[in-house]
Amino acid sequence: MKQFYIVDSSMLPEVVGKVIAARALLQNGEVKQVSEAVKQVGISRGTYYKYKDYVFLRDPEMASRKAVISLMLHHDRGILSEVLTTMSQVQASIVTINQNIPIHNWASVVMSFDISALQGTLDDLVTKLGDIRGVSDVHLVSVE
């Protein structure tokens, strides 16, 4: 299994930053060929190919934490709105919502949301959602 480290760039050889810069030139379309990119940043093609698949900038999107919950909502006006208001109050940023049609007046809902700025714990959120009138079977499905 691979191990990954987060390391301050000042601790790495200068070529690592240049490889990342060369890759960015290629991805952004500023240059068309590897030879142009490496010439522009001042490294050899061999150095680029040696490191290109192993060094990356930290992606801010990957730094966010995600959670998925499932719940059942009674088919009454305003219940989903109250769930979303509760999510907003604790700074849970909704990423996706999937609501099925109500069967016997109950609809299943699965929501994924960003919890990187969550105020409180996931257990508190699950409890708050379960306390809403018309909400039942609140389950935390996964956390990344």
From Swiss-Prot:
Covalent S-S links between cysteines: none
Stored SUPFAM superfamilies: ACT-like
InterPro entries in UniProt: ACT-like_dom_sf, ACT_dom, UPF0735_ACT_dom-cont
PROSITE patterns to which the protein is assigned, alphabetical: ACT
Boundaries of every ACT domain copy: 68-143
Superkingdom of origin: Bacteria
NCBIfam families in alphabetical order: PRK04435.1 (NF003361)
Family (UniProt): Belongs to the UPF0735 family.
Protein name: UPF0735 ACT domain-containing protein LSEI_1046
Lineage: Bacteria, Bacillati, Bacillota, Bacilli, Lactobacillales
